[in-house]
C-alpha cells in the first residue's frame, strides 16, 4: 500500500513537469494498474523483510524491467490513447526505482529499530522452575524487561536474590489474578516437558492467552492445542512456540502507525482552529479548557489523556454521588442528562468536538485513531482476566463501539465483546472502514450525547 503512494507521487510529478499540457488522469490510472500487475508478477513481497540491501536492489531492478516491458507493450497497442512522452516515462521509471528502493530500505531499518525498541519496552513475566532458572541470564543482550517471575517449584523464601534485582515474585497459586493487575506484554514459559502435567501448564497458557498477553513457550516443551494461534520463533536465544489469540501482518501494523501520524497531524490542525473559538467559551466558568486524566492503555500502561472540558471542574468529585444512577451494567459509567455537563459541553459532546485533543495522544503513540476506549484507572483495577483482553491493543479515539450506536449499549460485557471482535478481526482495512463510518456518524450527529 505504501509503495503505491510512491508510484503515484513519482508518476504525478514526472507527468506534470515533463509532459506538455498534461491534464489526463487516465495516464495515472494506467500507471497504477501496471504497478499492481507488476507487483504481483515480480513477487515483490516475497521474503520482503529478510532481503538484504543488495537483494532489495535486485528486486527493484526486476520490478522496473517488468514495468518497462509491460508498459512498452501496452503503449505500442494503445499508442494513440496516452499523452505520456518517452522522456517522462523513463524519468518516471528512474525516479520510481530510486524511491522504491529507499522506501523499502527505510521500512526494513525502521522495523529493525522499532523491534529493538519494542524489545526494550516489552514487559515480560517468566514462568519457570529452579533448574531452568539457574541456566538463564537476566537482562542480557536481548534487553527484554523482566518485571516478575513465577518459580513453580520454589517458595518465596527461595527467591531473595531475584527480589534484590527488583523482580516481583508471583506465587503460583495467584498467577492469573496477579497478571490481571500487572502491566504485562508477554510471558515466557521455560520448564521441561515432564513438568507440564504436574503444574498444569496448558491451563496456565490458556488463562494468560485469554488476557490478550502473548505467551512464549520453549520449543523443547510439548506442543498442544491452544485457544488462539501459534508459531515457532526465537525469544531470548531460545526456539519457542509463541501462542497468541492472533498474529498481525507487520506491514499492516506499520500502515496503522503511518495512518495514525497522518491523521493526528490533520486532527491537531483542526483542533487548533477550533480551539481559537471554543476555548473562551469553555473557560467562562473559570475552569481550564482542557480536561486531563490518567487512563489505561495497552496492556495496562498508564498515560495522560486529554479532552476539551465538557463538564464542571468538580465533575470527578460529584461522580461518586451519581454512581447509584449509572445506566451501564458493569465497569463503565454513563448517565443521560448528566448534571455535570456544562452548557457548551452539551454541544461539543454532541458534535464529538471534545475528542479533538486526543489527536495529541495519537501522535505521541499512547493511542491510535481506531481501537478500544481507554478505561479510567479505577475501572481498570476492577477488571477480570477476560476483560483485560480489550487492552491488548492500543486504545483509540473511535472503534466498533462508537459506530454501533453507543448510546443504545448499556451492558459493559457487550462493549467488551465488540472490542474483542475488533481485536480478533483487525486489519488496516478494518481501521479505514471504521474511520469512514465514524465520519458518517459524526456528520449525522448520531451515537454521541
UniProtKB/Swiss-Prot annotation:
What EC number(s) has UniProt assigned to this enzyme? 2.7.8.-
Question: What GO biological process terms are annotated to this protein in UniProt?
Answer: polysaccharide biosynthetic process
Which InterPro entries does the entry link to? Bact_transf, EPS_sugar_tfrase
| Protein keywords | Capsule biogenesis/degradation, Cell membrane, Exopolysaccharide synthesis, Membrane, Transferase, Transmembrane, Transmembrane helix, Virulence
A single MF term (Gene Ontology): phosphotransferase activity, for other substituted phosphate groups
Where do transmembrane segments lie in this chain? 5-22, 27-46, 59-78, 88-107, 258-280
* Chief localisation class: membrane
A GO CC term? plasma membrane
What does the record say about its membrane topology?
Multi-pass membrane protein
Q: According to the UniProt record, what class of enzyme is this?
A: transferase
Give the top-rank taxon of the lineage listed in the UniProt record for this protein.
Answer: Bacteria
> Subcellular location, in the record's words?
Cell membrane
What this protein is reported to do is described as:
Galactosyl transferase is essential for the assembly of the group B streptococci (GBS) type III capsular polysaccharide. May be involved in the formation of either or both galactosidic bonds by catalyzing the addition of galactose to an oligosaccharide precursor or to a lipid intermediate. Type III capsular polysaccharide consists of a linear backbone with short side chains ending in residues of N-acetylneuraminic acid or sialic acid.
Instruction: State the family it belongs to.
Output: Belongs to the bacterial sugar transferase family.
Q: What is this protein called?
A: Galactosyl transferase CpsE
Q: Which organism is it from?
A: Streptococcus agalactiae serotype V (strain ATCC BAA-611 / 2603 V/R)
